[in-house]
Amino acid sequence: RFLPNAFSSQNHIEEIKGVYVPFWLFDANASGSGLYEATTSSSHRNGDYVITTTRHYDVRRAGTTQFMGVPVDGSTKMPNGHMDAIEPYDYRAFQPFSTAYLPGYMADKYDEDADTCQARAHSRMQNSVSSELSASITGYSSVSTLSENISIDYTAKHYALLPVWMLHTKWQGKDYLFAMNGQTGKLVGDLPVDKRKVAAWFAGISVPLMILLAFLL
């Protein structure tokens, strides 16, 4: 259904299902500092020679930031790469959990607890702080990290069920998996897709699965 017409005769959609995927959402305050080596280079010609001058600088950066609702899926059944790639969700649309939203859709219970998932959230936050510190250094030919110190203080965690559409398809004898954000329609997968087909299909099924279910902890 989602593949371009050229692929239609060579693939078979095995399954499409709507799933409420368990997620842990982490809030935290983070601070970071780093020491970086930056260089600038300039060249000029002197007779038959080209002389290049490289200058080295020690650059220090420090900053703080706040993370709200960093999501980590708590189901080993779901591929982490797909779940990360279909972000973000609009948490302003959260609704208190109610079984009234579940008929017709699968709802997984987490099999990875908050402590296990916090390790992934921690890595994501650290990488984000590190990237922001490095990105703040501009105007140099090159920048390399000498040392960084990043501290993360967790302030809250939340448990939520977030809507995902999963599509399993077979093409040329191989199985492929697509995932779609059930709120925004963002689609990730391995094969080329016809975005017009995706948009048309999503328009028909998105409304009943746009509920984000939150558990108060």
Residue ranges and their predicted role:
Residues 1-170:
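Charged, low-complexity helical/coil segments in non-catalytic cytosolic or luminal regions
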Residues 162-191:
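Extended, hydrophilic extramembrane loops/domains of integral membrane proteins
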